[in-house]
Structure formats: structure tokens, C-alpha cells
């Protein structure tokens, strides 16, 4: 079972971004493979720390994790800890920490005199999400797409599989997503395929290297000469797609489900974004939800409350017989076990609570009125609170003594 991301970084759930980054830097330096050669345990911890930081440093992923646990972020965090993933993309935080300690400066600029001046170059090419190798092959990442999925309480109780059509950006079939009419692209003449431009500045403290995204190709490393007339060189166009969504039992209104790679297609061969499905719970005409339990209001006649009875009540999957014990008082909650919402993490379901209320007719006929008058004469059925011979209170007795 995966450990809690907050526990891995050793921070509270209320920690802000600075606290999370500080904890990450400390642990990343501690378990970095260069400091722990041939140490498998340290290597695994380093991956674990990167995975936790990738989620908690991203506002959207952190919100999904807080609401839905590891299921809310799916496998995105784990995939991010490999080469080219977001986890190693934040490895610059480690280099920033090295610069803080040894050169006294912050930021991304590097000096030729720093003992770690070449350290970042090694990793940015092999691991960083901003490395030139990634730009040459990955294109532009597609954007995430968010939709709302309305579900009934019955669907939420058992879990459901939905197949729906959505509108999204899809890969252009005419150019196969390249954006080029001929299907070919050329190496960018400005950055020569690296996706970035570098400018060296010499100062009295050494040489600074400033790196920025290539303005010609936007960081892709390649340019389109003969634009596709169907997608205007973007490699994507508006379209439709059919997606299958598996919703587990026990989700709540506002929960997120993330379908990896089901979002908008990326321009010119870029990886697709994710489809974020926001759960919307429809109001139910019979039941009210309380966590994984549901509540049903049942009106019962006065005679049945007094003498007891058996009544058929609805559930989310049919009807069951409920025994009303003799002498049941109004607003009593009777429990029917296992007839509520399935638990999100599995292992059973919540309960159905029947709230018993007394039924009071708005109008009665002459015969029924006579029956009620007869019942009213019984002090057991209707205690006569207006009887002058009722037992006096202690205050009334004291008043009689001193009057």
C-alpha cells in the first residue's frame, strides 16, 4: 500500500508550498543517488519523495489527492518519477539548494566558478521535463479537459460504468497530427532542434548562462513549413470521442476521476492531456444522504405506533419489511443494515435509517371525529394536562404553605 504523500515529506496537510518545497529539497538531497551510490533503499526513497512532491506541488493534483486519496491522482504521480517525468522536472530545486549552499545565490543562472556548474547540465538533458531531448520528440502537451457527470444515488451506491460522447480536440487525420501538409517537419533554424536558446554573459564573478524557450518553434525544436489546410498547422482540430468511465461505489458530489490521456490531443504530436470527470450527485426524491448512510422519512399512523406493526419500506434496490416496535416514539430512527451506499474503499456498505414520524390527518369525517373523542377520554392515550386535580408542583405547594 502506498504511503501518504504528506507523511513521506514529513509535513502537515495544511502545509503551504514553501514548506513542501523546503521539505522536498532536504529529502531529495539526503537520498539523491549521487550521494548514495549502489544503495537501493535510498534510490526507492528518492523516487518516493519525487512522486510525493510532484503531486503536492501541483495545486490541481493536490486538490484531487486531498479529496480522493491516491485514486484521485491515478498513476500520474508514479509515471512522473521516471525519466522525462514531472518528478525529475523539479530536480532543479535540488540544484537551487546546492547553489544556495555553495555560491550564496538563488535562481537558475549558473556561474562558471561554481563547483556544481556542470551538475545541472547533466541532469537537464536526461531527466528534466525542460530538457532539449524531450522538446524534440514530445511536441506540446495537450490541455486537460474537465466535464461533469451526473449520477443518481442508485448508481453511486453500487458503482456504475458510463459510456458517453464528449467534444474535444482530436488529432488531425489529414496530416496525422504533424501540422504539415506533407506530413514532414523541419529542424528549427534558430535553436537547431534543441528547443531552447542560450546566451552567455561574462561578469567579474564568472560566466552566466541564460536559457530560454526558442521563440521560433516555441520549444518544440521543429517547425512546419507547408501548413496543413485542415488544421492550419496545429495538428489538432475540434472533434468528438467516445469514452468509458468506470465510477466506483461511494463517490461523493464534487469528487474527481482522472482518465489519463483522454483529454485534448497535443498540437503537432504532443502527448494528450487528461480527462477530469467531476461527479455531480442528483437529488433523490425519497432519500437523503449522510456519508455512506441514507435516511428515509416514514409517516406512521398513531395506532400503529402504539401497538406496533410491520411496514414495507423502499430501499435503493427494492423493498424490505420493517418492524415498528410497539410504543415507538415520533422521530425514532430505525436502522436497516447494509442498505446504504457502498464504501469507496470497499468492504461493505452504509445503512438505511428510517425516521419514524406520526401521521396527522388534516381533515377527519364525523365518524372518525367521534372515535377520536372517545380516545381522548382515555388518560393513557391522551394525558389530560388541563385537569384541575393534577399533582401540584413543588412551587405551588410552597405557595399554599405561606399563603
Curated annotation (Swiss-Prot):
GO cellular component, one term: cytoplasm
GO BP field: chaperone cofactor-dependent protein refolding; DNA replication; protein refolding; response to heat
Entry keyword annotation includes Nucleotide-binding: no
Protein keywords: Chaperone, Cytoplasm, DNA replication, Metal-binding, Repeat, Stress response, Zinc, Zinc-finger
Cofactor note: Binds 2 Zn(2+) ions per monomer.
HAMAP family: DnaJ
Subunit field text: Homodimer.
Name this polypeptide is given: Chaperone protein DnaJ
Lineage, opening ranks: Bacteria, Pseudomonadati, Chlorobiota, Chlorobiia, Chlorobiales
Amino acid at each position: 500500500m502506498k504511503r501518504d504523500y504528506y507523511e513521506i515529506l514529513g509535513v502537515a496537510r495544511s502545509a503551504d508550498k514553501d514548506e513542501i518545497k523546503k521539505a522536498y529539497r532536504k529529502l531529495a538531497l539526503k537520498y539523491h543517488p549521487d550521494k548514495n551510490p549502489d544503495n537501493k533503499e535510498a534510490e526507492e526513497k528518492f523516487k518516493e519523495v519525487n512522486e510525493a512532491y510532484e503531486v503536492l506541488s501541483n495545486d490541481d493534483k493536490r486538490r484531487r489527492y486531498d479529496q480522493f486519496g491516491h485514486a484521485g491522482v491515478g498513476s500520474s504521480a508514479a509515471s512522473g518519477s521516471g525519466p522525462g517525468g514531472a518528478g525529475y522536472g523539479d530536480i532543479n530545486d535540488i540544484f537551487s539548494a546546492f547553489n544556495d549552499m555553495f555560491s550564496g545565490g538563488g535562481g537558475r543562472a549558473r556561474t562558471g566558478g561554481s563547483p556544481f556548474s556542470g551538475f545541472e547540465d547533466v541532469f537537464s538533458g536526461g531527466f528534466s521535463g525542460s530538457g532539449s531531448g524531450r522538446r524534440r520528440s514530445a511536441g506540446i502537451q495537450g490541455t486537460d479537459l474537465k466535464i461533469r457527470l451526473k449520477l443518481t444515488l442508485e448508481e453511486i451506491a453500487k458503482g456504475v460504468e458510463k459510456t458517453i460522447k464528449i467534444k474535444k480536440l482530436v488529432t488531425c487525420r489529414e496530416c496525422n497530427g504533424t501540422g504539415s501538409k506533407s506530413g514532414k517537419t523541419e529542424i528549427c533554424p534558430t535553436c537547431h532542434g534543441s528547443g531552447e536558446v542560450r546566451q552567455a554573459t561574462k561578469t567579474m564573478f564568472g560566466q552566466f548562462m541564460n536559457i530560454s524557450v526558442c521563440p521560433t518553434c516555441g520549444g518544440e525544436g521543429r517547425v512546419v513549413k507547408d501548413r496543413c489546410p485542415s488544421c492550419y498547422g496545429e495538428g489538432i482540430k475540434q472533434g468528438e470521442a467516445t469514452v468509458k468511465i468506470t465510477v466506483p461505489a461511494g463517490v461523493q458530489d464534487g469528487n474527481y476521476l482522472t482518465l489519463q490521456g483522454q483529454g485534448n490531443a497535443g498540437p503537432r504530436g504532443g502527448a494528450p492531456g487528461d480527462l477530469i470527470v467531476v461527479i455531480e450527485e442528483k437529488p433523490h426524491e425519497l432519500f437523503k444522504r449522510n456519508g455512506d448512510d441514507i435516511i428515509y422519512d416514514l409517516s406512521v399512523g398513531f395506532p400503529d405506533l402504539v401497538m406496533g406493526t410491520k411496514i414495507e419500506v423502499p430501499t435503493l434496490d427494492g423493498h424490505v419489511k420493517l418492524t415498528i416496535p410497539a410504543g415507538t416514539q415520533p422521530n425514532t430512527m430505525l436502522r436497516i443494515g447494509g442498505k446504504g451506499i457502498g464504501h469507496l474503499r470497499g468492504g461493505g456498505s452504509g445503512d438505511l435509517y428510517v425516521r419514524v414520524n406520526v401521521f396527522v390527518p388534516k381533515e377527519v369525517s364525523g365518524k372518525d371525529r367521534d372515535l377520536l373523542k372517545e380516545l381522548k377520554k382515555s388518560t393513557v392515550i391522551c394525558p389530560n394536562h388541563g385537569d384541575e386535580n393534577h399533582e401540584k408542583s413543588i412551587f405551588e405547594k410552597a405557595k399554599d404553605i405561606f399563603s
